[in-house]
Structure formats: structure tokens, C-alpha cells
Amino acid sequence: DYERFFAELLTLAQNVIHITMAKHASDGYLNAVEAAKSFENVTVIDSGHLSSSMGLIVLFAAYMAEHHASKREIIENVKTLRDYISSAFIIDSTHMMCRAGRVSKRVQVLCDALLLHPVIHLRKSRMTVGGLEMGDFSHMARSYVRRVFRDARHIDRRILFITYAGMDEERLKYIQQLVRQYCPFERVYLQKASSAIASNCGPGAFGLLFMKKNEAVISFSQASKPDM
């Protein structure tokens, strides 16, 4: 019950900024917007993302709040940041996508026969197929990681989430090895995918989720540093 949730939060804070999953992938955004109409000081923002990529936006918003940014500053920067989150998953098998009606049975059979693996992107709050990789797991994982990190100059290397569904330890270690090879990060977190990702992408899917360098993050980070 969002109204009760917001009411409880407002006993602890003067304003609430609630960041939701992509509005076209979940009912959470619309339900939160409806509940927020009962309050003057609750703002609901569509993150445009799912799973750990939404978490990156929340982490930045929390960082701004802890460093005494205004409500307006947080809202504006969060909306800007949405376009600088890299959020894509590669699918090991299209069976779950077929079951969910996202691809036809014919496409699923073709992908199985040719070892094709769709890459799902989050764009404008929607999940769309943004490309294909080919081959067994080791080949498709290497190709996907190399493609994601092909323009490493524009990647914020502080935090990377390797978000996965139904994957064994050996495969996770292999992905981490590829990350270290192509684009090492200061901190790497292994994170099980949200139900929205897992139910659409199926077991064996994984994504590399991170921020791209952008003026909103750089400017605020510099401004919040204490004077020497």
C-alpha cells in the first residue's frame, strides 16, 4: 500500500523522492503516482531502468541527499542520470521470452538452432532487443563484454553490477575475468537479478550495469568535496 508507505516515510522526513522501476515494465510507477496525489511533498520518478541499474540511480540520489542537495537538485540530476546508465542483458536461451510472448516460437527455434543470443536493452523505460551474439556461452559472453566496454573512455569505473539469473559459480568467475581484462572497475558487485529481469530473460542471462561519465555526477561530486 503506497499511501501507507509514504505516510510512514513522511514521519521521518519533510520530503520523499520515490524512484521506481521502468514504468513500462512494472505497475509500480503508476500505483506510486496515484498514491502520491494524496500528499503535497511526495515526488515519484520513473528510473527508466530495472534491477541494479535502478539501484545505481538510487545510490546517486542517496549520495546527493546525504550531501545536503536540495529536492530540486536531486530530481533534476536523477532525471539527467537516467540517460547515462548502461542497462543491457544478454539472454542464454529464448525459451522464457517465447513463453512470455516476446518472441515467436519460430524465432525461439531459430535461436536454438543457430546459437543466437539476444541482447535486451532498457530504453525509454522499455525492454527492447538491441542486438544478437552468437556461439556457446564462453564465446557469446566474451563478445558481449567486449562490445559493452568498447568505448571505455566514457565509462565511470567506480561501480559495476554483474547482475545475473540462474548462473553457476564457474560462469560468474569467467565473466569477472572478462571484466578485468576489458574494463576493470574499482568495485564489482555480483547481484541476483530482480524478478522482472529473471522472468523475462530466463536462467543463464546476465548484464553489466554501470554509469557512463556525465556532467551531473562529476559536477556534484566535485562540489561536495570538502575544501582542503
Task: Label the predicted regions.
Residues 1-9:
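Glycine-rich oxoanion-binding loops at beta->alpha junctions
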Residues 15, 25-43, 49-228:
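Mixed-charge interfacial surface used for oligomerization/domain docking
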Residues 18:
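Glycine/small-residue-rich loop that forms an oxyanion/phosphate-binding "nest" at active or ligand-binding sites
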Residues 21-22:
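Short, well-ordered beta-to-alpha junction loops that form the rim of enzyme active sites
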